[in-house]
Amino acid sequence: MRHRNTGRYLGRNSSHRDSMLKNMIISLIRYEIIHTTLQKAKELRKILEPLITISKINSISNRRNIYSKIRNNEIIHKLFNDIGPRFLKKNGGYLSILKSGYRKGDNAYMAYIKFTNTKKNI
């Protein structure tokens, strides 16, 4: 039975799914907006928003905690020095998902995911 198992499979096995979501986290922090399928964007939001909450307090233990999940010093530096302080007065809702229609070819529903207070346009 599948009781209390949360998350989407996204048509991949667990190791592929974990590495794909980790790469998407890195891309979103680096570029502050990415274009992906709606289901991947929703899954990414569930993973990244708690990391942003942790990054609002810049301590060595928080850095190590996030490093265990991301493993990229450049991204961790940007997360703690740029993105975390940007959301100090905000409690959640750091990411917004903007639907952008269907993809030509396989008709998958596409969306943009971005930080709510980013200066970059679509």
Curated annotation (Swiss-Prot):
Keywords (A to Z) from UniProt? Ribonucleoprotein, Ribosomal protein
Please give one Gene Ontology molecular function term for this protein. structural constituent of ribosome
The keyword Ribosomal protein appears for this protein: yes
Query: What GO CC terms are in its UniProt record?
Result: cytosolic large ribosomal subunit
The record's Pfam families line, in alphabetical order, gives: Ribosomal_L17 (PF01196)
Q: Please name the InterPro entries in this protein's record.
A: Ribosomal_bL17, Ribosomal_bL17_CS, Ribosomal_bL17_sf
Question: Superkingdom, according to UniProt?
Answer: Bacteria
Q: Does the keyword Ribosomal protein apply?
A: yes
Biological process annotations from GO: translation
Q: Which residues cross the membrane?
A: none
* Homology family: Belongs to the bacterial ribosomal protein bL17 family.
Q: How does it assemble?
A: Part of the 50S ribosomal subunit. Contacts protein L32.
Q: What is this protein called?
A: Large ribosomal subunit protein bL17
Taxonomic lineage of the native organism = Bacteria, Pseudomonadati, Pseudomonadota, Gammaproteobacteria, Enterobacterales
